[in-house]
From Swiss-Prot:
Subunit text: F-type ATPases have 2 components, CF(1) - the catalytic core - and CF(0) - the membrane proton channel. CF(1) has five subunits: alpha(3), beta(3), gamma(1), delta(1), epsilon(1). CF(0) has three main subunits: a, b and c.
Lineage top rank: taxon: Bacteria
InterPro entries noted in UniProt: ATP_synth_F1_ATPase_gsu, ATP_synth_F1_gsu, ATP_synth_F1_gsu_CS
Protein family membership: Belongs to the ATPase gamma chain family.
Highest classification ranks of the organism: Bacteria, Pseudomonadati, Pseudomonadota, Gammaproteobacteria, Methylococcales
Keywords, comma-separated and alphabetical: ATP synthesis, Cell inner membrane, Cell membrane, CF(1), Hydrogen ion transport, Ion transport, Membrane, Transport
UniProt cross-references to PANTHER family, sorted A to Z: ATP SYNTHASE GAMMA CHAIN, ATP SYNTHASE SUBUNIT GAMMA, MITOCHONDRIAL
Protein name in UniProt: ATP synthase gamma chain
Length: 287
């Protein structure tokens, strides 16, 4: 029963792997729920800032913050949000394909692209293809904080403020539901006040201290930071959801493989028993 022994070893190995994938599925489900709660908490902050920015921009039309002025596009900056780890299906590869398509389109139009990368997978991939990576940060963990990405954001915001790039985008995965995550490329700058929150019907006039210009300058930076952080938290939720689905699929496939191996083992065992009976009967007949 040498063949039977090999099959039993394979079955035991697959069962051990199945235990690991089931545990990873449960961990990912728990992390996804926590990340969804964080995502819901970040959205009102960005919406409130957008509302104030629109109010300030409409109340002071003569002042144009550099982040609200459109200019000819010769250079583009993209903040890419990816995961640090794999085992999450095609989450990262789908996002990378979207960004590569846009980078090719920009390249054909003579537009240069500069990247600020968040996440190990994005840093490894775009570093490997020779992209212009101006800044990167990796290993932020499962509960990232804004302080962890400030360095990358400052590099990209300074580049925009100094005219080194003419448009700024953020690329991340959008959380639709547990089964669906969509790659998304969102424009951060220039900000178009008319496209911000439309909750200004019947609003009050406010007095700002120290003055409206200073408040607007500070809020625009905070607004862009909040959008990127929201994208980071959303991408984190997508990662955990994709990992949960991938590990469930792996566990299901392991179960199917165990059944197939068990069937092969039973057939091999049955054939061995039949062979032994035939040999015994043959020996008795010879006597």
């Amino acid at each position: 029963m040498a063949v039977g022994k090999e099959i039993r070893i394979k079955i035991a190995s697959v069962r051990n792997t199945q235990k690991i994938t089931r545990a990873m599925e449960m961990v990912a489900a728990s992390k996804m729920r926590r990340t969804q709660d964080r995502l819901q908490a970040t959205r009102p902050y960005a919406r409130k800032i957008a509302r104030i920015i629109k109010h300030l921009a409409q109340a002071n039309p003569e002042y144009k913050n550099p982040f609200m002025v459109e200019r000819p596009v010769k250079r583009v900056g993209v903040v890419l949000v990816s995961s640090d780890r794999g085992l999450c299906g095609g989450l990262n590869s789908n996002l990378f394909r979207l960004l590569l398509r846009r980078m090719r389109a920009w390249g054909e139009a003579g537009v240069e692209v500069r990247l600020g990368v968040i996440g190990q997978k994005g840093a490894s991939f775009f570093g490997g293809v020779g992209a212009d990576v101006a800044a990167q940060v990796v290993r932020l963990g499962d509960t990232p904080h804004l302080e962890g990405i400030i360095g990358v954001l400052k590099v990209m915001l300074d580049a925009y403020g100094e005219g080194e790039i003419d448009e700024l985008y953020v690329a991340h995965n959008e959380f639709v539901n547990t089964m669906t995550q969509k790659p998304k490329l969102e424009c951060l700058a220039p900000i178009k006040a008319e496209e911000l929150s439309d909750e200004l019907k019947g609003h009050w006039d406010y007095l700002y201290e120290p003055d409206a210009k200073t408040v607007l300058d500070a809020l625009i930076t905070r607004y862009i930071e909040s959008l990127v952080f929201q994208g980071l938290v959303e991408n984190n939720a997508c990662e955990q959801a994709a990992r949960m689905v991938a590990m469930k699929s792996a566990s299901d496939n392991a179960g199917k493989l165990i059944k197939e191996l068990q069937l092969i083992y039973n057939k091999a065992r049955q054939a061995a028993i039949t062979q032994e009976i035939a040999e015994i009967v043959g020996g008795a007949a010879a006597v």
